[in-house]
């Protein structure tokens, strides 16, 4: 059987299984009050007519992106879900693996704590490619917390937290499906269905399949602009409620093959080339989680909960003759207790335990006679936290948290965090925050994509990363007749006391991950204005300024490959009966510093010293029907592409080969079409 037939068979099996499951569904409405396990997201109630991005009423600086906002773009996965967000930047981390990276508060996504339903997720080896592991149609909402946040979820948040909420087993029974195809020959199929088995017991199955047919080389440098990614992603979730007891649990698996590198279609043409440079990534990931909660005192919101998750992540990564192979296992558990001490006082306390194991084989040279090196990393961390919240009517909220953790590597460390929200008049919210965060660095796991570089990669002895974050913000909601205006301004400062620095500058022939020796900080200022009219028209304009610097070779320099500013404008229009919806997003990404250039053998410099600002335009039109919608759109319609993202592409085996210094889009304009199906739900 040919490979194309196998791919088609996979997709048919997945869709057929879900359709069969859908046909067995009992479409009875259910109303399960899941207050205990969803207490951290109960600030908003989402309906279709509300704004797509909502400012949380909590003490934290938190925005919640719901499905209405996600539907404004294709949003094939989590990495593509921030297209319309002024706060989060998304780009490719390199021109070789197709990995997406985000930046929050001007800093890498490694400093954002990733959560799925309030549990830590996608750490270590999963981190560089994690944003394509969460299919967009599976998500119910995304909450983005900036700066210091709660200590409940651990100590790893430095610039903020991103929490993904999936569609729920206990939601109204129904079936949803999504099919997507674009001009880059990418196909995606998604399906989700849930069923109420009996009173209090529900289950859900989510399925995702994607494949790219053929390769694309728009700049004719002999390298695929994006990899051929074939992914199968399955998730089975359960919910049971009996009296005061609630259980959530589930299992998931991801199987992904990513193929890229030299030649236009290496699947079929590799045999015709004498020595092609190929990049292959093969991932197998297995997940299991459970949540138990028991309501002790409903009048005081007293409850006790036990949450646990276990993951195994296997990655075989080949970069030419270099390689990184890892078998990672991690376990996390948390026991927590919450209660209202009185009308104005709330207390939360808990214990946590985590264990990380990475068995790694590493080959950093193309020399075929060099054997891989074995590296083992193991860390266990036990901790406890206490968090107190004071509220006075709707005007003042104070939240202070302190946690202490003991690491088998770094011994004892303390994490204090403080948040305050004050509402002097109706509609005006003032917030301030301060807090600390820590992070254990697994350099080869988190930066293995840098092995694609021809430079010699060196990793120094690294300490635990440590930083303080401070934030101030103000948002004001004003009604002018039937029009709604929301003005938001915010400033954040992140100050690193210890950091792992990726250094392209000190030595042209080396790429070093070294311990910070000097200052490293980030200042970000953002202002945005949202206007909502009663006539189906809304718009958001935003501007953000970044000042991000670190010490490289004893010099305090701008962080390379980081835009100095971002300006964004989004416009949405729905026709009176909401049959049609039109969305447009325009952004201007400011210029920035490039790493120190080096001389190529032909006498030219590898690149300049800075990159200029560049624009991007995305549009989408959606036609809504009763049980389905059809959407079509285009991305990067300005057709801006970074020139020569792969340096010295004709000789990838040399030290001059460099595909990891990406600062802009690496492929041009793209069009897509898709359909969303929804049965059994409003």
Which residues make up each language-model segment?
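N-terminal periplasmic "start-of-domain" segments of outer-membrane beta-barrel proteins
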Residues: 40-73, 101, 120
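Extracytoplasmic beta-strand/coil segments of soluble accessory domains associated
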Residues: 79-120
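Short acidic/polar hinge/loop motifs at secondary-structure boundaries
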Residues: 119-146
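Short strand-turn segments of transmembrane beta-barrel domains in outer membranes
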Residues: 148-151, 161, 165-196
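Flexible loop and strand-edge segments within Gram-negative outer membrane beta-barrel domains
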Residues: 212-233, 241-304, 310-328
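Membrane-embedded beta-barrel scaffold of Gram-negative outer-membrane proteins
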Residues: 303-317, 423, 431, 463-521
């Amino acid at each position: 059987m040919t490979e194309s037939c196998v791919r088609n068979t996979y997709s048919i099996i997945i869709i057929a299984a879900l359709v069969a499951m859908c046909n067995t569904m009992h479409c009875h409405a259910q109303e399960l009050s899941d207050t205990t396990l969803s207490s951290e997201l109960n600030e908003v109630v989402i309906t279709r007519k509300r704004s797509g991005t909502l400012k949380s009423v909590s003490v934290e600086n938190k925005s919640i992106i719901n499905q209405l906002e996600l539907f404004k773009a294709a949003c094939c996965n989590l990495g593509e879900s921030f297209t319309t967000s002024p706060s989060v930047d998304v780009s490719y981390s390199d021109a070789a693996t197709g990995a997406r990276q985000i930046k929050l508060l001007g800093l890498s996504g490694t400093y954002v704590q990733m959560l799925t339903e309030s549990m830590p997720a996608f750490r270590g080896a999963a981190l560089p490619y994690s944003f394509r592991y969460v299919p967009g149609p599976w998500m119910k909402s995304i909450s983005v917390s900036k700066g210091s946040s709660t200590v409940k979820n651990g100590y790893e948040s430095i610039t903020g937290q991103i929490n993904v909420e999936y569609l729920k087993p206990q939601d109204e029974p129904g079936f949803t499906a999504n099919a997507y195809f674009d001009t880059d020959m990418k196909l995606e199929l998604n399906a989700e269905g849930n069923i109420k088995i009996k009173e209090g017991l529900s289950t859900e199955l989510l399925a995702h399949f994607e494949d790219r047919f053929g390769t694309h080389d728009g700049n004719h440098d002999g390298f695929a602009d994006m990899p051929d990614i074939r992914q199968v992603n399955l998730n089975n979730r359960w919910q049971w409620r009996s009296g005061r007891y609630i259980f959530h649990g589930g299992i998931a698996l991801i199987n992904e093959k990513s193929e890229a590198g030299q030649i236009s279609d290496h699947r079929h043409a590799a045999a015709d080339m004498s020595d092609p440079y190929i990049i292959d990534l093969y991932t197998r990931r297995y997940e299991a989680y459970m949540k138990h909660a028991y309501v002790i005192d409903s009048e005081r919101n007293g409850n006790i909960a036990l949450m646990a998750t276990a993951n195994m992540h296997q990655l075989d990564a080949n970069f030419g003759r270099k390689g990184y192979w890892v078998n990672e296992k991690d376990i996390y558990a948390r026991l927590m207790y919450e209660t209202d001490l009185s009308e104005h006082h709330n207390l939360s306390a808990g214990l946590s335990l985590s264990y990380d194991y990475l068995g790694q084989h590493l080959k950093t040279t193309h020399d075929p006679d060099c054997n891989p090196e074995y590296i083992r990393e193991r860390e266990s961390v036990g901790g406890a936290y206490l968090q107190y919240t004071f509220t006075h009517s709707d005007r003042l909220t104070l939240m202070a948290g302190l946690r202490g953790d003991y690491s088998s590597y770094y011994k004892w460390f303390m994490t204090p965090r403080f948040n305050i929200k004050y509402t002097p008049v109706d509609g005006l919210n003032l917030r301030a925050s301060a807090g600390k965060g820590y992070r254990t660095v697994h350099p080869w796991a988190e930066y293995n994509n840098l092995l694609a570089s021809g430079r010699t990669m060196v990793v120094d002895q690294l300490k635990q990363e440590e930083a303080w974050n401070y934030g101030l913000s103000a948002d004001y909601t004003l009604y002018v007749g039937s029009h709604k205006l929301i003005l938001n301004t915010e400033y954040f400062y992140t100050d690193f006391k210890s950091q792992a620095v990726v250094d392209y500058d000190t030595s042209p022939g080396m790429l070093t991950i070294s311990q910070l020796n000097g200052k490293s900080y980030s200042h970000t200022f953002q202002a945005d204005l949202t206007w909502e009219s009663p006539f189906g028209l809304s718009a958001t304009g935003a501007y953000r300024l970044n000042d991000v610097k670190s010490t490289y070779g004893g010099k305090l320099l701008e962080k390379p490959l980081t835009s100095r500013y971002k300006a964004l404008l989004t416009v949405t229009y729905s026709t009176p009966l909401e049959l049609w919806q039109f969305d447009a997003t325009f952004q201007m990404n400011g210029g920035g510093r490039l790493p120190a250039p080096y001389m190529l053998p032909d006498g030219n410099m590898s690149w300049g010293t800075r990159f200029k600002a560049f624009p991007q335009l995305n549009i989408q039109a959606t036609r809504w029907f009763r049980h389905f919608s059809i959407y079509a759109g285009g991305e990067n319609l300005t057709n801006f592409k970074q020139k020569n993202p792969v340096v010295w592409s004709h000789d990838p085996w040399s030290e001059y080969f460099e595909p990891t210094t990406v600062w802009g889009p690496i492929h041009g304009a793209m069009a897509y079409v898709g359909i969303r199906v929804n049965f059994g739900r409003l």
